[in-house]
């Protein structure tokens, strides 16, 4: 249990904890679940620079690599206990503590409601999502303040050693899938889903332990090195068509920050969401072209995948709503939003998609 580790860590963290207030300056040390080179960490550093600028240097954030203070699996508990000032991960990492975390971090199949990454942000900003997100931490009984920073999706279905033409082909393969509800949904449709840490994926592919894998989208996937092992890349997937990363600040440390500077941090977080969304479109486009030059074949996901995954996702979502009142409340809020917004948004995006595909065809 995490609490049993606290005493062992406390002595080692005395020097670390000296990041407390000094002359009105709050310095926050924030551990990521990633190493220091990932593009996500770069965006976190950009956020930290904005915070420092908007607070005139009264609040500064230092980003530490994954595992540098506590194991990544203990990160949210360490922030809660005050062993570390803050953490950075994806909200759905904590679905084991509360299933509703998935509806904020990676609502499978667009929460079963046709919500894409941009529509999810509309719900978050304009239809009560932010207030429910703030409530999530109380529901999890955690002394943290969450800051949604990075909408990343849509994520790709993944990388395969050979083409798949149907779900029957997919079911023959061992597939690295996200942990938690997305991975379970794959199992529900008969896919041999395997959960493993990022550092284990490429070795597992090289050794034949797994046959296919997902991680994110073109830029992170290219940087990860999937193209060195696999050549068939399927962009359209439903397990994380919406995916978001966030920062968690210990509640006591947060209360040491003035109300004015807290507001500045929220403004910086809003800017970070825009930066992440807009930068990803361009960066993923550049990375996709690079992958194609390296011999990667871009494939279309079989139609029966969408039918089967959507049905299983809806069953999983309903089961969680039946079992957890707060999950049901969040999902109902998303449904109310979707009933009003998705018919318009999906219709508008349909014409945009056709326009984009027509232009893309001229480039071949």
Please identify what each model-predicted range represents:
Residues 1-8:
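Bacterial N-terminal signal peptides that target proteins for export
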Residues 14-22:
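Sec/Tat signal peptide C-region and signal peptidase I cleavage site
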Residues 23-119, 138-364:
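N-terminal secretory/targeting leader peptides
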Residues 119-120, 133:
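Divalent-metal coordination cores built from histidine and acidic residues
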Residues 126-141:
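Hinge/lid segment of periplasmic solute-binding proteins
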């Amino acid at each position: 249990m995490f609490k049993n580790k606290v005493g062992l860590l406390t002595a080692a963290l005395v020097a670390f904890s000296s990041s407390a207030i000094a002359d009105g300056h709050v310095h926050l040390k924030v551990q990521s679940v990633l190493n220091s080179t990932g593009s996500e960490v770069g965006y976190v550093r950009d956020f930290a620079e904005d915070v420092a600028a908007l607070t005139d240097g009264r609040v500064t954030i230092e980003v530490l690599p994954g595992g540098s203070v506590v194991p990544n699996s203990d990160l949210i508990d360490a922030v809660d206990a005050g062993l570390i000032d803050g953490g950075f991960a994806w909200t759905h990492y904590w679905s084991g503590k509360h299933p509703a975390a998935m509806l904020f971090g990676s609502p499978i199949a667009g929460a079963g409601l046709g919500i894409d990454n941009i529509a999810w942000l509309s719900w978050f900003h304009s239809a009560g999502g932010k207030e429910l997100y703030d409530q999530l931490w109380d529901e999890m009984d955690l002394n943290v303040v969450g800051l949604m920073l990075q909408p990343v999706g849509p994520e790709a279905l993944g990388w395969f050693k050979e083409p798949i033409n149907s779900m029957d082909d997919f079911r023959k393969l061992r597939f690295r899938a996200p942990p938690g509800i997305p991975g379970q949904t794959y199992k529900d449709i008969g896919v041999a889903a395997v959960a493993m840490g990022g550092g284990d994926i490429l070795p597992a592919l090289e050794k034949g332990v797994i046959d296919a894998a997902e991680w994110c989208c073109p830029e992170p996937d290219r940087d990860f090195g999937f193209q060195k092992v696999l050549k068939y890349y399927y962009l359209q997937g439903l397990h994380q068509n919406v995916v978001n990363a966030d920062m968690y600040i210990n509640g006591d440390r947060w209360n040491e920050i003035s109300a004015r500077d807290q507001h500045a941090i929220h403004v910086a977080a809003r800017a970070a969401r825009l930066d992440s969304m807009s930068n990803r479109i361009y960066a993923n486009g550049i990375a996709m072209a690079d992958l194609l030059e390296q011999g990667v074949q871009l494939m279309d996901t079989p139609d029966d995948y969408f039918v089967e995954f959507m049905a299983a996702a809806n069953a999983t979502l309903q089961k969680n709503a039946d079992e957890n009142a707060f999950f049901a409340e969040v999902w109902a809020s998303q449904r109310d939003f979707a009933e009003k917004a998705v018919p318009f948004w999906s219709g508008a995006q349909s014409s945009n998609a056709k326009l984009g595909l027509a232009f893309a065809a001229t480039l071949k």
